[in-house]
């Protein structure tokens, strides 16, 4: 049975899992809550989606430190939604990466989305006082970007409108693993916000 996503009536803590899904590739999950991907390279770590608050992000960091002491240098934002990005400051990464469209949506809708998700998902925003503000990318790209973590290559790709107008995926060629943000759901219907109904399957076949 699929786990329900956090809501106003969902105040119980979820069981955290930290699962290796490929060589030095990890998935931080918590029974249907927003997840985080972890890519460990030769010399550094990349985070895919940052969690809703620094409090939750620190739980990710704790799990990372159980498997590596390499520095976290990159945080990748798959899209702009508050529950996935506002924990970014906890990683102390030198670069925060997103699509140009995602950056535009943070400008246009970031505060509105923060206010909305804060009201709808109170459990995810426990400890919200530590959020320093909206999460702003330091690097953006239009279509594709390659990040080298030593010998490990990560391909970041904007494949068209999907869950939002600016979603990206992260592909790790050496393990054939892709992190998809909210474009793909497991045992659950997609969370519909600004989804583009006519286009969401196209990126999966690109």
PLM-predicted stretches and their roles:
Residues 17-63, 168-182:
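Conserved beta-strand hairpin/beta-sheet module of binuclear metal-dependent hydrolase folds
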Residues 18, 42-44, 54-98:
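Active-site metal-binding motif and surrounding structural segment of the metallo-beta-lactamase
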Residues 24, 39, 49, 64, ...:
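Divalent metal-coordination and catalytic microenvironments
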Residues 27, 46-49, 73-76, 155-156:
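Short catalytic-loop micro-motif centered on adjacent basic/acidic residues
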Residues 54-55, 80-86, 103-106, 164-167, ...:
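Active-site environment of divalent metal-dependent phosphoester hydrolases
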Residues 104-159, 173-174:
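Metallo-beta-lactamase
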Residues 143-145, 149-194:
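Ligand/cofactor pocket segment of small-molecule handling proteins
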Residues 195-199, 203-206:
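Single conserved hydrophobic/aromatic residue that forms the stacking wall/gate
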């Amino acid at each position: 049975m699929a786990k329900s996503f956090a809501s106003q009536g969902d105040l119980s803590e979820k069981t955290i899992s930290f699962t290796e899904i490929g060589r030095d590739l990890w998935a931080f999950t918590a029974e249907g809550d927003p997840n985080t991907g972890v890519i460990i390279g030769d010399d550094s770590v990349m985070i895919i989606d940052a969690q809703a608050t620094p409090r939750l992000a620190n739980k990710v960091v704790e799990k990372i430190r159980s498997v590596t002491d390499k520095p976290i240098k990159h945080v990748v934002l798959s899209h702009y939604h508050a529950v996935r990005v506002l924990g970014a400051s906890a990683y102390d990464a030198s670069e925060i990466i997103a699509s140009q469209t995602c950056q535009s949506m943070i400008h246009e809708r970031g505060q509105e989305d923060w206010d909305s998700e804060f009201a709808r998902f109170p459990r995810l925003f426990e400890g919200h006082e530590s959020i320093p503000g909206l999460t702003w990318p330091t690097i953006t790209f239009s279509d594709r970007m390659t990040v080298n973590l030593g010998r490990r290559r990560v391909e970041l790709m904007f494949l068209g409108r999907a869950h939002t107008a600016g979603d990206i995926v992260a592909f790790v060629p050496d393990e054939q693993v892709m992190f998809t943000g909210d474009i793909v759901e497991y045992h659950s219907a997609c969370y519909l916000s600004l989804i583009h109904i006519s286009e969401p399957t196209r990126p999966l076949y690109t």
